[in-house]
Amino acid sequence: MDQAALRAGISPDAIVSPAAFVAPGASIAAGCRIGPGCVVGPDCVLEEGVELLAHVVLDGRVRLGAGVKVFPFATIGLPPQDLKYKGQPTGVAIGARTQVREHATIHRGSVGGDGWTRVGSDCLIMCVVHIGHDCRIGDGVILVNNIMLAGHVEIGDFAFIQGGAAVQQFVRIGRMALVAGMSGVERNVLPFGRVKGYRAKLHGLNTIAMRRRLGLSKEQVMTVARAVHDLYRGGRPEEHVAAVAAAHPGNPHVAEVLDFARDRGRHGLCPFGRLGEDDELDG
Protein backbone atom coordinates (compact mmCIF):
# COMPACT_ATOMS: atom_id res chain seq x y z
CA MET A 1 0.00 0.00 0.00
CA ASP A 2 1.40 3.42 -0.93
CA GLN A 3 2.28 5.91 1.79
CA ALA A 4 -0.43 8.41 0.76
CA ALA A 5 -3.15 5.80 1.26
CA LEU A 6 -1.60 4.62 4.51
CA ARG A 7 -1.57 8.16 5.92
CA ALA A 8 -5.05 9.09 4.70
CA GLY A 9 -6.38 9.01 8.25
CA ILE A 10 -3.23 10.35 9.91
CA SER A 11 -2.85 14.07 10.57
CA PRO A 12 0.29 15.58 9.04
CA ASP A 13 0.99 16.97 12.52
CA ALA A 14 1.09 13.50 14.08
CA ILE A 15 4.40 11.75 14.68
CA VAL A 16 4.41 8.03 13.92
CA SER A 17 7.53 5.93 14.40
CA PRO A 18 8.57 3.98 11.30
CA ALA A 19 8.70 0.97 13.62
CA ALA A 20 4.97 1.30 14.45
CA PHE A 21 2.08 -0.20 12.48
CA VAL A 22 -1.04 1.90 11.91
CA ALA A 23 -3.70 0.06 9.92
CA PRO A 24 -5.45 1.83 7.04
CA GLY A 25 -8.72 3.23 8.36
CA ALA A 26 -7.37 4.40 11.72
CA SER A 27 -7.89 8.07 12.56
CA ILE A 28 -4.91 9.83 14.16
CA ALA A 29 -5.42 13.50 15.09
CA ALA A 30 -2.92 16.34 15.23
CA GLY A 31 -0.29 16.22 17.94
CA CYS A 32 -0.46 12.46 18.43
CA ARG A 33 2.75 10.53 18.98
CA ILE A 34 2.97 6.82 18.26
CA GLY A 35 6.18 5.15 19.37
CA PRO A 36 8.07 2.12 18.11
CA GLY A 37 6.43 -1.28 18.24
CA CYS A 38 2.90 0.10 18.60
CA VAL A 39 0.03 -1.54 16.70
CA VAL A 40 -3.09 0.52 15.97
CA GLY A 41 -6.06 -1.26 14.40
CA PRO A 42 -8.24 0.05 11.57
CA ASP A 43 -11.20 1.03 13.76
CA CYS A 44 -9.23 3.13 16.24
CA VAL A 45 -9.71 6.87 16.74
CA LEU A 46 -7.05 8.90 18.55
CA GLU A 47 -8.00 12.50 19.37
CA GLU A 48 -5.52 15.37 19.61
CA GLY A 49 -2.36 14.87 21.60
CA VAL A 50 -2.71 11.15 22.35
CA GLU A 51 0.63 9.53 23.08
CA LEU A 52 1.42 5.82 22.73
CA LEU A 53 4.92 5.44 24.11
CA ALA A 54 6.06 2.06 22.74
CA HIS A 55 4.76 -1.48 22.18
CA VAL A 56 1.14 -0.49 22.80
CA VAL A 57 -1.62 -2.54 21.12
CA LEU A 58 -5.00 -1.00 20.22
CA ASP A 59 -7.50 -3.41 18.67
CA GLY A 60 -11.19 -3.26 17.81
CA ARG A 61 -13.18 -0.05 18.11
CA VAL A 62 -11.01 2.09 20.38
CA ARG A 63 -11.68 5.78 21.09
CA LEU A 64 -8.96 7.65 23.00
CA GLY A 65 -9.81 11.19 24.15
CA ALA A 66 -7.49 14.16 23.81
CA GLY A 67 -4.26 13.91 25.76
CA VAL A 68 -4.56 10.25 26.73
CA LYS A 69 -1.15 8.71 27.42
CA VAL A 70 -0.54 4.97 27.16
CA PHE A 71 2.66 3.39 28.43
CA PRO A 72 4.60 0.39 27.08
CA PHE A 73 3.00 -3.05 26.77
CA ALA A 74 -0.51 -1.89 27.63
CA THR A 75 -3.29 -3.41 25.50
CA ILE A 76 -6.64 -1.74 24.85
CA GLY A 77 -9.61 -3.15 22.98
CA LEU A 78 -8.73 -6.82 22.72
CA PRO A 79 -11.70 -9.23 22.77
CA PRO A 80 -13.54 -9.79 26.05
CA GLN A 81 -12.89 -12.92 28.08
CA ASP A 82 -16.46 -14.01 27.53
CA LEU A 83 -17.32 -17.31 25.85
CA LYS A 84 -20.51 -15.76 24.45
CA TYR A 85 -18.49 -13.27 22.42
CA LYS A 86 -18.36 -14.19 18.73
CA GLY A 87 -16.49 -11.26 17.20
CA GLN A 88 -19.23 -8.63 17.30
CA PRO A 89 -18.09 -5.01 16.70
CA THR A 90 -17.68 -3.76 20.27
CA GLY A 91 -15.17 -1.32 21.71
CA VAL A 92 -13.45 0.75 24.38
CA ALA A 93 -13.82 4.50 24.99
CA ILE A 94 -11.38 6.38 27.24
CA GLY A 95 -11.83 10.02 28.26
CA ALA A 96 -9.39 12.89 27.95
CA ARG A 97 -6.08 13.01 29.82
CA THR A 98 -6.36 9.54 31.32
CA GLN A 99 -3.08 7.69 31.78
CA VAL A 100 -2.80 3.94 31.20
CA ARG A 101 0.41 2.55 32.63
CA GLU A 102 2.57 -0.44 31.73
CA HIS A 103 0.99 -3.85 31.13
CA ALA A 104 -2.55 -2.67 31.86
CA THR A 105 -5.30 -4.49 29.92
CA ILE A 106 -8.66 -2.94 29.02
CA HIS A 107 -10.98 -5.30 27.14
CA ARG A 108 -13.65 -4.25 24.69
CA GLY A 109 -17.34 -4.54 25.58
CA SER A 110 -19.54 -7.53 24.95
CA VAL A 111 -23.01 -8.15 23.57
CA GLY A 112 -24.14 -8.66 27.17
CA GLY A 113 -23.83 -4.90 27.73
CA ASP A 114 -24.12 -1.97 25.35
CA GLY A 115 -20.98 -3.06 23.54
CA TRP A 116 -18.61 -0.57 25.16
CA THR A 117 -16.14 -0.59 28.01
CA ARG A 118 -15.87 3.00 29.23
CA VAL A 119 -13.18 4.80 31.22
CA GLY A 120 -13.70 8.46 32.14
CA SER A 121 -11.43 11.49 31.93
CA ASP A 122 -8.44 12.25 34.17
CA CYS A 123 -8.12 8.69 35.46
CA LEU A 124 -4.88 7.00 36.46
CA ILE A 125 -4.77 3.32 35.54
CA MET A 126 -1.55 1.99 37.08
CA CYS A 127 0.62 -0.97 36.08
CA VAL A 128 -0.91 -4.42 35.49
CA VAL A 129 -4.49 -3.30 36.11
CA HIS A 130 -7.13 -5.38 34.34
CA ILE A 131 -10.42 -3.73 33.35
CA GLY A 132 -12.86 -6.36 32.12
CA HIS A 133 -15.50 -6.06 29.44
CA ASP A 134 -18.39 -3.63 29.87
CA CYS A 135 -16.90 -1.88 32.90
CA ARG A 136 -17.94 1.73 33.56
CA ILE A 137 -15.22 3.82 35.20
CA GLY A 138 -16.05 7.43 36.12
CA ASP A 139 -13.87 10.54 35.97
CA GLY A 140 -10.83 11.02 38.18
CA VAL A 141 -10.69 7.39 39.31
CA ILE A 142 -7.37 5.98 40.54
CA LEU A 143 -6.72 2.26 40.10
CA VAL A 144 -3.47 1.23 41.78
CA ASN A 145 -1.19 -1.59 40.57
CA ASN A 146 -2.45 -5.15 40.06
CA ILE A 147 -6.17 -4.46 40.44
CA MET A 148 -8.59 -6.91 38.79
CA LEU A 149 -12.01 -5.69 37.70
CA ALA A 150 -14.36 -8.36 36.39
CA GLY A 151 -16.91 -7.62 33.69
CA HIS A 152 -19.69 -5.04 34.14
CA VAL A 153 -18.14 -3.39 37.21
CA GLU A 154 -19.19 0.24 37.75
CA ILE A 155 -16.99 2.74 39.61
CA GLY A 156 -18.11 6.28 40.43
CA ASP A 157 -16.14 9.50 40.00
CA PHE A 158 -13.00 10.01 42.10
CA ALA A 159 -13.08 6.57 43.68
CA PHE A 160 -9.70 5.26 44.86
CA ILE A 161 -9.00 1.52 44.60
CA GLN A 162 -5.74 0.46 46.22
CA GLY A 163 -3.31 -2.13 44.92
CA GLY A 164 -4.15 -5.80 44.51
CA ALA A 165 -7.90 -5.41 45.01
CA ALA A 166 -10.27 -7.73 43.14
CA VAL A 167 -13.83 -6.74 42.26
CA GLN A 168 -16.52 -9.26 41.32
CA GLN A 169 -18.58 -8.82 38.16
CA PHE A 170 -21.58 -6.47 38.30
CA VAL A 171 -20.38 -4.85 41.54
CA ARG A 172 -21.01 -1.11 41.86
CA ILE A 173 -18.58 1.17 43.71
CA GLY A 174 -19.92 4.62 44.56
CA ARG A 175 -18.45 8.06 44.06
CA MET A 176 -15.38 8.86 46.18
CA ALA A 177 -15.36 5.41 47.74
CA LEU A 178 -12.07 3.93 48.91
CA VAL A 179 -11.22 0.23 48.59
CA ALA A 180 -8.23 -0.88 50.65
CA GLY A 181 -5.40 -2.83 49.09
CA MET A 182 -5.78 -6.60 48.64
CA SER A 183 -9.52 -6.45 49.32
CA GLY A 184 -11.99 -8.80 47.66
CA VAL A 185 -15.12 -6.82 46.80
CA GLU A 186 -18.17 -9.02 46.28
CA ARG A 187 -20.90 -6.48 47.07
CA ASN A 188 -21.67 -2.86 46.29
CA VAL A 189 -19.77 -0.06 48.04
CA LEU A 190 -21.66 3.07 49.11
CA PRO A 191 -20.58 6.50 47.88
CA PHE A 192 -17.91 7.85 50.27
CA GLY A 193 -17.60 4.37 51.84
CA ARG A 194 -14.31 2.84 52.89
CA VAL A 195 -14.10 -0.93 52.67
CA LYS A 196 -11.41 -3.48 53.34
CA GLY A 197 -10.86 -7.15 53.91
CA TYR A 198 -10.58 -10.49 52.14
CA ARG A 199 -14.38 -10.32 51.99
CA ALA A 200 -14.68 -6.56 51.98
CA LYS A 201 -16.76 -4.89 54.68
CA LEU A 202 -17.55 -1.25 55.35
CA HIS A 203 -15.08 0.12 57.90
CA GLY A 204 -15.70 3.84 57.69
CA LEU A 205 -16.03 6.76 55.32
CA ASN A 206 -13.46 8.29 53.02
CA THR A 207 -13.40 11.39 55.20
CA ILE A 208 -10.26 12.83 53.61
CA ALA A 209 -11.90 12.98 50.18
CA MET A 210 -15.13 14.35 51.66
CA ARG A 211 -13.26 17.20 53.31
CA ARG A 212 -10.72 17.99 50.61
CA ARG A 213 -12.73 17.44 47.44
CA LEU A 214 -16.20 18.40 48.69
CA GLY A 215 -15.07 20.92 51.29
CA LEU A 216 -17.29 19.41 53.98
CA SER A 217 -16.82 20.35 57.62
CA LYS A 218 -16.35 17.74 60.34
CA GLU A 219 -19.96 18.26 61.38
CA GLN A 220 -21.21 17.69 57.83
CA VAL A 221 -19.16 14.50 57.55
CA MET A 222 -20.59 13.32 60.87
CA THR A 223 -24.11 13.85 59.56
CA VAL A 224 -23.42 11.51 56.65
CA ALA A 225 -21.78 9.05 59.06
CA ARG A 226 -24.84 8.99 61.31
CA ALA A 227 -27.04 8.34 58.29
CA VAL A 228 -24.84 5.40 57.30
CA HIS A 229 -24.96 4.06 60.88
CA ASP A 230 -28.74 4.22 60.80
CA LEU A 231 -28.83 2.53 57.41
CA TYR A 232 -26.99 -0.47 58.86
CA ARG A 233 -28.99 -0.64 62.10
CA GLY A 234 -30.16 -4.27 61.89
CA GLY A 235 -31.58 -6.11 58.91
CA ARG A 236 -30.80 -5.24 55.32
CA PRO A 237 -29.75 -1.61 54.73
CA GLU A 238 -32.32 -1.26 51.94
CA GLU A 239 -35.07 -1.72 54.53
CA HIS A 240 -34.06 1.48 56.36
CA VAL A 241 -33.77 3.87 53.41
CA ALA A 242 -37.14 5.57 53.93
CA ALA A 243 -36.56 6.15 57.65
CA VAL A 244 -33.06 7.56 57.11
CA ALA A 245 -34.32 9.84 54.34
CA ALA A 246 -37.02 11.20 56.64
CA ALA A 247 -34.41 11.90 59.34
CA HIS A 248 -32.11 13.82 56.98
CA PRO A 249 -34.31 15.84 54.61
CA GLY A 250 -32.56 18.11 52.13
CA ASN A 251 -29.04 16.76 52.67
CA PRO A 252 -27.61 16.09 49.18
CA HIS A 253 -24.81 13.82 50.38
CA VAL A 254 -27.12 11.65 52.44
CA ALA A 255 -29.51 11.58 49.48
CA GLU A 256 -26.70 10.34 47.24
CA VAL A 257 -25.95 7.50 49.65
CA LEU A 258 -29.62 6.54 49.89
CA ASP A 259 -30.22 6.68 46.13
CA PHE A 260 -27.33 4.27 45.72
CA ALA A 261 -28.63 1.97 48.47
CA ARG A 262 -32.10 1.78 46.91
CA ASP A 263 -30.69 0.07 43.83
CA ARG A 264 -29.67 -3.26 45.32
CA GLY A 265 -28.59 -4.68 41.98
CA ARG A 266 -27.28 -8.24 41.92
CA HIS A 267 -25.23 -8.12 45.09
CA GLY A 268 -26.59 -5.72 47.70
CA LEU A 269 -24.32 -3.62 49.90
CA CYS A 270 -21.08 -4.64 51.59
CA PRO A 271 -21.79 -5.67 55.19
CA PHE A 272 -20.76 -3.47 58.08
CA GLY A 273 -17.45 -4.42 59.68
CA ARG A 274 -16.37 -3.95 63.26
CA LEU A 275 -14.51 -0.66 63.67
CA GLY A 276 -10.93 -0.88 64.89
CA GLU A 277 -8.35 1.66 65.97
CA ASP A 278 -7.50 2.47 62.34
CA ASP A 279 -11.13 3.03 61.35
CA GLU A 280 -13.39 6.02 61.61
CA LEU A 281 -16.98 6.57 60.67
CA ASP A 282 -17.63 9.78 62.54
CA GLY A 283 -15.12 12.01 60.75
Model-derived regions: residue spans:
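Structural signal for interior beta-strand "rungs" in well-ordered beta-sheet cores
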Residues: 4, 9-201
